[in-house]
Amino acid sequence: MNANNSYLNLKINKLDFKITKAVIKESLDQIFLCECEGFYENINNDIFSDDNIEFDPNMLIDKEASLIIKNPYENKKIDFSTNIDMIYKGIISYVEYLGVNQGSVSNIVKENFKQLNHKHFFKFNLHSPLIRLDFNKANRIYTHTNIIEAIKQTLAYYNTKLNKNIDFSNIHHIYETKELISQYNESDLEFITRLAHNHGIYFYEDKDNIYFYDFYTHKGKTKDIVFNPNINNHLNEACIYALNKEKQIQTNAFTHSSNNSKQPLSLYSLSTKAQNTNTHYNEHYYESEYSFTQNINLKQSPTLKEKRNSMLNNTLKAKSNIYHLSLNESIKINIQKETTKEYTIIAKEQILIDDAILANTINTNDNLNIKDLNLSKSYTNNLTLIPSFLTFTPSFKSKPKPPINTMGMVIGEDSNIENQRNTIYTDEYGRVKVRINLYANQEELDNKTNMYHHSPFLRVASNVASNHSGFYHTPRIGDEVIISFLDDDIDKPFISGSLYNGVN
């Protein structure tokens, strides 16, 4: 590969930057980030003149960009099946201008350059376009829908900003309808990540699509990878050259005296060491027949925690020089002649260096020989693998902490409160419909004030609620009510009281 031809290029608008160093981090647990440094050659020394306004960081930030990785090896005969280009498409989330360096005259003569170019050096962060969902926090409420539809509705706000297809074709499970799904003081990215991960759904992207999975199904041909632990791989054989296993101490079961809050598995008796079916997971349950509502608990289930624990126990770390491996891809590793195991890539960190293209960029007053600069061209990656018989289970996300109390207004069947004021409107269980003040901005911005799916039916607390006895009152349309949250859960609001005001 010619010293002046980089195997790394970053294209922003119509500008083509040569990249000298890049670190790319991607995982099924979080969106990808690429931190890179490179330069753009320009005949002008002052790149920020009026004639070069396109180089101003203000013109580069938040622009779509593509990082293109070509085969990094001199030996093109290495069988990568095809010498494909790996492309990462995202947006520029950070720009820093590092300065200008003029090429060495002596080296320019050797390279037969006909004109004097100036290298203007920049530092960039290339982020997944999903980072645009993380810029602002929002309060929203969804009723009578499931988590998949809530995710789709949230993503629909960004139809013109993602510029990638959203693919839900790998969602195989059926998700029950929730009476209430709340987003409180969360960015849209935090919200869809919490909903997805707490239900065992993960998402990732390639250059054209964003994929959602809840069950891994392999597509395409499985790549056969050689395991070669020899550090003297002078021919740059495409291989995995290191495999490591990590393990940290943790409790593996419940007992009556202690439990592991991070990884609850099956419940065991302290004395018998056998599963005790009479012992229950330490969490409150509210059955629908008693609470007049479907299960609105959006916390992760012990089953998912068990799946994640099993996945973590079978995770492997690997190092390779194979540049064309993709996230969520299945590979077969030939550890020995008769031993082949299949794995799925769940995380990848790539370190790419190509400062050999700077060979003609030295200060002529340094009297330093080019061969002493230790310039290099290299590629390596760190992989996280799980056996292919396991499905990736993402880490769990905690819910936002709700306010202690908030206000709300009882409303009726439509938005005309004045005509219905002081009348009673309930559902079949005696619950009243409330417009919660937390979500008033959502209704105003969406221009859907008092719409049904923004105003849930809530239960009303009472001093005494016994069989055939107790206190009972029903807040009327137009009443101001106090909203509290059961178990400090944003998805479990109820009416804890009412307030007099100037109207009533």
Predicted feature locations:
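Amphipathic alpha-helical and helix-coil boundary elements used as assembly
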Residues: M1-N504
